[in-house]
């Protein structure tokens, strides 16, 4: 698979019709896991374009495992097992680099994930609750999707962020669920000041509309709770109280 993704090039301007292309370029760098170089004139980049760099920084040092290496001329399914990365969750990247739609069906048990599971997608913020053990994804041509995979233990948990493609593994720490106080808390840190969101799964038995946040602002109150936070190089604490 790719051992050197070369320089990341996404241009300096926002080009909506090329959004999926830019996403794929950024994901290719992430699945490599190694050093990245900037292929654009950074000083002239729109913030939206520069973000394709920042979501890869810092690099993780972990390359994904291509699950279909011997099935296709160019692999499309990449897995980061948490047992190898040391992350608290698995990551799965799908890259449809063809001119035809693709339907994917992945048995999570083949990835070492058993029982009820959750799959949170980085770009679209879609959440899939998986009861039958299969993640089913339909991708249009030339499209990439990137999932954080979690076991559903029936308690609130961090399912992702929009700060980094590891979705919490490099930027979130000290996460704790206190069942007596009904609070979920943690800290977030980034190389520099940065605004973004932490996404929390709120299972049945908890009312997300009654949630109260400290150190963050609640931007949506569905089963996936979006917390807007201001991160910095110093760890920033956050907490969500789920009132009875």
Language-model segments: residues:
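Accessory, solvent-exposed terminal regions and/or long lumenal/extracellular loops of proteins
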Residues: 153-209
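Active-site-proximal substrate-binding groove within the catalytic cores of carbohydrate-active enzymes
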Residues: 1-127, 132-153
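C-terminal beta-strand-rich structural cap/linker in extracellular carbohydrate-active enzymes
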Residues: 131-169, 223-244
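Solvent-exposed beta-strand/loop surfaces of large extracellular or lumenal domains
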Residues: 116-134, 210-229
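Non-cytosolic beta-sheet module surface loops
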Residues: 96-98, 108-110, 139, 188-192, ...
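Short beta-strand/loop motifs in extracellular/secreted proteins, especially
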Residues: 102-104, 115-117, 194-198, 206-209, ...
